[in-house]
Amino acid sequence: MADNSSDECEEENNKEKKKTSQLTPQRGFSENEDDDDDDDDSSETDSDSDDDDEEHGAPLEGAYDPADYEHLPVSAEIKELFQYISRYTPQLIDLDHKLKPFIPDFIPAVGDIDAFLKVPRPDGKPDNLGLLVLDEPSTKQSDPTVLSLWLTENSKQHNITQHMKVKSLEDAEKNPKAIDTWIESISELHRSKPPATVHYTRPMPDIDTLMQEWSPEFEELLGKVSLPTAEIDCSLAEYIDMICAILDIPVYKSRIQSLHLLFSLYSEFKNSQHFKALAEGKKAFTPSSNSTSQAGDMETLTFS
């Protein structure tokens, strides 16, 4: 009985040793796992701190530093306002781009006709293209005579003697289209011509000053006395002096500049929309004025 009990005790001890031997590596493995978890946590915190450093970055040069403004002799309210500068955090807003780059669709099209004007001469001499020769498409060439007139008009060099090309047509009766084209081009040249500028050698009033309304006394006088007409018995020079005196145009020894100002004033009155409307109203009023004159009521209309 004693031997059997001792054998049973030994077997139990062996079983306990096996259990402990099986449990010891598991404990070691768990300890290693704990160490690995600690390392992972530390690496994650390091990476987070690195990301924060990258986001915030180093302080920019010239940025706001609260230490620079601590010594200012200001009240507590102003110092409180300075604290709002450091508290403010700007918001990142993604702006939508209105213009986006894109590649346009390929659209085949017929190009311009190549007139071969860029081809150099075979002898190698310069052709002065663009200086002496105008680079134009071959489909619509300009008339050299009209072009020289345009250049002369734009440069305002009318007194320079130069060789001008004179265009002539053979059998003009059979080519009316060329004549119409010439008339149209010359008419366009005259339409685009700016008005002539005249510089007076003596002081002359402005056109706007001469177009001002007359005084009521003078208008009343004109209602009683009519203006002198060309049938008056006087010379042409005296008649010019009278008309210029009525219109407040000064007259000097040479009456050419006074006459130019007189005709310029007449042209301004003729082209004025205001006086055109007055003239049309006067024409429309003529029948009624006749009826009133027949009734015996006289009315005088003055336009200034």
UniProtKB/Swiss-Prot annotation:
Forms part of a complex involved in intraflagellar transport (IFT), the bi-directional movement of particles required for the assembly, maintenance and functioning of primary cilia. May play a role in chondrocyte maturation and skeletogenesis. It is found in: Cytoplasm, Cytoskeleton, Cilium basal body; Cell projection, Cilium. Signal peptide: none annotated. Belongs to the IFT46 family. GO terms for biological process: cilium assembly; intraciliary anterograde transport; intraciliary transport; protein stabilization; smoothened signaling pathway. The modification Phosphothreonine is found at T286. It holds the Pfam family IFT46_B_C. Component of the IFT complex B, at least composed of IFT20, IFT22, IFT25, IFT27, IFT46, IFT52, TRAF3IP1/IFT54, IFT57, IFT74, IFT80, IFT81, and IFT88. Interacts with IFT57, IFT88 and DAW1. Interacts with IFT56. Interacts with ARL13B. Interacts with TTC25. Interacts with IFT70B. The keyword Thylakoid does not apply. The keyword Methyltransferase does not apply. This is Intraflagellar transport protein 46 homolog. PANTHER family: INTRAFLAGELLAR TRANSPORT PROTEIN 46 HOMOLOG. Residues 286-304 have a biased composition (Polar residues). Residues 1-13, 31-55 have a biased composition (Acidic residues). One of its GO terms (cellular component) is cytoplasm. It comes from the Eukaryota. Residues 1-67, 285-304 are annotated as: Disordered. It comes from Homo sapiens. Keywords: Cell projection, Cilium, Cytoplasm, Cytoskeleton, Phosphoprotein.
